Amino acid sequence: MQPYQRDFIRFAIDRGVLRFGEFTLKSGRTSPYFFNAGLFNTGSALAELGRCYAAAIVDSKIPFDVLFGPAYKGIPLAATTAVALADQHQLDVPWCFNRKEAKDHGEGGSLVGAPLAGDVLIIDDVITAGTAIREVMQIINAQQAKAAGVLIALNREERGNGELSAIQEVERDFGIPVVSIVSLTQVLEFLADDPQLKQHLPAVEAYRAQYGI
């Protein structure tokens, strides 16, 4: 585990973004942990989150020309990551986002920011069913651009209804890598090393044995 990954898990736990207990997911599964990136909701939290995304981008070595944040949740993520890439890594990267509804006046159309062109790195919080990414792929294709990959905060490493996870389905269907700041593997590693949180390890391991990929 890289230092930025350990920092991210500790930060997510401290912010209440990553919690342990008993949670019913939209899928109907009862999960021993829950991840809610919406709670990175202050200036300092967003700044730290951007630094973690930026570190993951540099670590991934995925070549790209522009960062794209899908509306709505991806917009602040793309913005803070672009700032962190410039501040921490001296990489001045263009970024853009889409509107949910196209405007017909002012800065018209459905895209805002830098031109969506070349190799596009999509940035979002999680991939649950892959539906949002499929919509993004249509936007990118409509601009004659090309997806370089997807970056998310957490990979749950969990099967969907079939044998594959939603992330594996995206990788298979579009032939692009999906990388994450951390995956469940690293969360388990963190729990094993933390005396206070170790009590949650058996439940998370059991859940992984049942639903993991």
Swiss-Prot record:
GO CC term, one of those recorded: cytoplasm
Protein name, as recorded: Orotate phosphoribosyltransferase
Keywords carried by this UniProt record: Glycosyltransferase, Magnesium, Pyrimidine biosynthesis, Transferase
Function per UniProt: Catalyzes the transfer of a ribosyl phosphate group from 5-phosphoribose 1-diphosphate to orotate, leading to the formation of orotidine monophosphate (OMP).
Organism field: Pseudomonas putida (strain ATCC 47054 / DSM 6125 / CFBP 8728 / NCIMB 11950 / KT2440)
Assembly mode: Homodimer.
Binding site for orotate: 34-35, 128, 156
Pathway: Pyrimidine metabolism; UMP biosynthesis via de novo pathway; UMP from orotate: step 1/2
Reaction(s) this enzyme catalyzes, per UniProt: orotidine 5'-phosphate + diphosphate = orotate + 5-phospho-alpha-D-ribose 1-diphosphate
EC number: 2.4.2.10
Pfam families: Pribosyltran
A GO BP entry: pyrimidine ribonucleoside biosynthetic process
PROSITE patterns: PUR_PYR_PR_TRANSFER (PS00103)
